[in-house]
């Protein structure tokens, strides 16, 4: 799509020049953006464009100029001598890179007809506006960051953001279109600040960590990492495991000590917590007493602190903590609230200004060092991803020889019957949602399978057994399983026994760390 927009000059030139990094100069030799001075690699916060300007080529003076000077007329493309170095623009580099990515090439990779790609590109660019929602599925593929980068580049070219009817990204119940507020905090002594992990858990499994004990909140061992067999080996080598969870999950089975936690509906106090979300301030009001031996997160935290002789620094009650984080907010609207005032509104108090829908980026100011929409990531130059460059998934692609042995891509998808692995054990839901793997009927026929058959799903990592179901909406070459399926509800084994745990090297440079590629997994299926 980007290639069509560039080739047919369908881009929004005003938006590109004035609100993106596409006219910024790049040193051809290093691939780095031209700045006023070298950045400090140890700086905790990147310098702003005001502190360390980016540069463009000013066509009026035929010289480099700071990007944010009002009188500058930046060149969109070209190659220039800048202080003895050959420099070009991000836009020029993008055009060069996109030459190989024709609609015909995209058809060969994706199966989407080239004519459809051209039509979609033209409709997206010519608008007048487009709201592009979704993107949630490919976050389980090894190359997911490239897809997100490419989407941002399309937006930068067309200006499909910051105007009525336009936007891009994952629509998650008000995260981006909702209003926000800021709670205060309970002050703690300096020696009670959070420590720093030696390394993330997915790296600790490789055997290089010093960690001997783990405290897990929720089903971290099964839900957060692929390849459960490797995770199990790591867990066996630990001296001590504690799991805090309302549910008896796969991770809980590995625990030496289980601290049963309450759900959001149970509390030993009238008010347990307070959150801001979905344009409202919401109290966690008590619905029922804690069941059985379950305890609240607040109680568990206090008891752990007591063992270290630090409980005196924590609030005496959860109501006291809630009152404090409200009153200490730097937002006057929030700090004026009390528990009684919020409960007078049935525990859900609207944030200020929610009568007007929140429209993001209407001022075309972005949360980047330059305050522009940044599509050139020079921190990823060494990985060849300063601009989005296609690379196949880690495992699930046609060019992988492994596909000759394991020809099906296993996709982990959401279901309306559960929230991840929560409610797995709800008996009345189980009658509608027996764990099954779904295949296209053509794949069923190849394997001599019928709906309801018990099958084994396997690869060189491991296997599990469940029942199979035909589904014409599943593409040939694919298999679908609702995520969060655990061993207690399968015939045998665990879905995570087969899932991919690899990740790309550049993952450490990404804002949220590497992608865990659960759906970037190849399997074969046979009758059990």
List where the protein language model places each region.
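Conserved short loop/turn motifs at secondary-structure junctions
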Residues: 105-113, 135-142, 174-175, 219-222
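Acidic/polar loop patches that form or flank catalytic/metal-binding clefts of enzymes
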Residues: 10-15, 117, 131-132, 160-170, ...
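A glycine-rich phosphate-binding loop feature that marks nucleotide/adenosyl-phosphate handling sites
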Residues: 18-23, 123-124, 167-178, 317-330, ...
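Long, well-ordered, tryptophan-enriched scaffold segments
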Residues: 2-127
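Long, contiguous, secondary-structure-rich segments that constitute the structural scaffold
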Residues: 141, 287, 297-342, 423, ...
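Extended redox/cofactor-interaction regions of prokaryotic respiratory oxidoreductases
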Residues: 70-81, 90-93, 108, 151-254, ...
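Phosphate/diphosphate-binding loops
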Residues: 230, 236-240, 245-249, 285-305, ...
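Glycine/threonine-rich phosphate-binding loop and adjacent beta-strand/alpha-helix elements that clamp
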Residues: 265-290, 299-300, 305-307
């Amino acid at each position: 799509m980007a290639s069509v927009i560039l080739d047919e000059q369908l881009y929004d030139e005003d938006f590109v020049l004035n609100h993106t990094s596409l006219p910024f100069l790049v040193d051809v030799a290093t691939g780095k953006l031209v700045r006023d001075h070298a950045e400090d690699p140890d700086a905790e916060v990147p310098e702003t464009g005001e502190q360390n300007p980016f540069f463009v080529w000013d066509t009026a003076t035929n010289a480099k100029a700071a990007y944010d000077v009002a009188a500058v007329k930046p060149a969109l493309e070209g190659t220039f001598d800048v202080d003895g170095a050959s420099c070009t623009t991000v836009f020029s580099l993008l055009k060069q890179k996109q030459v190989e990515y024709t609609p015909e090439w995209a058809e060969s990779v994706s199966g989407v007809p080239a004519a459809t790609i051209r039509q979609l590109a033209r409709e997206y660019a010519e608008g007048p506006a487009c709201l592009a929602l979704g993107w949630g599925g490919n976050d389980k593929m090894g190359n997911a960051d490239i897809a997100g980068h490419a989407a941002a580049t399309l937006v930068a070219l067309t200006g499909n953001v910051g105007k009525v009817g336009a936007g891009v990204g994952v629509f998650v119940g008000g995260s981006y279109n909702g209003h926000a507020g800021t709670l205060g905090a309970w002050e703690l002594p300096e020696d009670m600040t959070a420590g720093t992990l030696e390394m993330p858990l997915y790296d600790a499994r490789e055997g290089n960590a010093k960690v001997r004990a783990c405290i897990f909140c929720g089903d971290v061992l099964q839900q957060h990492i692929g390849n459960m067999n490797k995770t199990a080996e790591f867990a066996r080598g630990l001296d001590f495991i504690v799991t805090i969870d309302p549910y008896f999950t796969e991770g809980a089975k590995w625990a030496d000590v289980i601290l049963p936690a309450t759900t959001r509906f149970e509390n030993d106090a009238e008010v347990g917590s307070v959150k801001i979300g979905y344009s409202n301030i919401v109290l966690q009001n008590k619905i029922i007493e804690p069941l059985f031996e379950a305890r609240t997160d607040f109680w568990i935290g206090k008891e752990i602190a007591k063992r270290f002789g630090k409980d005196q620094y924590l609030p005496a009650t959860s109501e006291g903590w809630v009152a404090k984080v409200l009153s200490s907010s730097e937002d006057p609207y929030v700090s004026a609230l009390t528990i009684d005032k919020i409960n007078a509104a049935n525990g859900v108090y609207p944030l200020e200004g929610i009568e007007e829908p929140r429209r993001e980026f209407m001022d075309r100011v972005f949360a980047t060092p330059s305050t522009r929409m940044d599509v050139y990531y020079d921190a990823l130059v060494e990985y060849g991803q300063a601009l989005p460059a296609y690379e196949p998934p880690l495992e699930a692609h046609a060019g992988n020889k492994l596909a000759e042995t394991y020809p099906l891509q296993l996709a982990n998808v959401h279901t309306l019957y559960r929230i991840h692995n929560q409610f797995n054990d709800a008996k009345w839901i189980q009658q509608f949602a027996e764990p099954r793997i779904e295949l296209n009927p053509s794949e069923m026929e190849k394997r001599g399978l019928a709906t309801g058959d018990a099958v084994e799903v396997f690869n060189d990592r491991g296997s599990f057994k469940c029942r199979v179901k035909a589904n014409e909406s599943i593409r040939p070459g694919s298999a679908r399983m609702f995520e969060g399926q655990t061993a207690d509800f399968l015939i045998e084994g665990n879905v995570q026994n087969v899932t991919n745990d690899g990740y790309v090297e550049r993952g450490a440079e990404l804002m949220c760390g590497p992608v865990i590629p659960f759906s970037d997994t190849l399997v074969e299926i046979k009758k059990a």
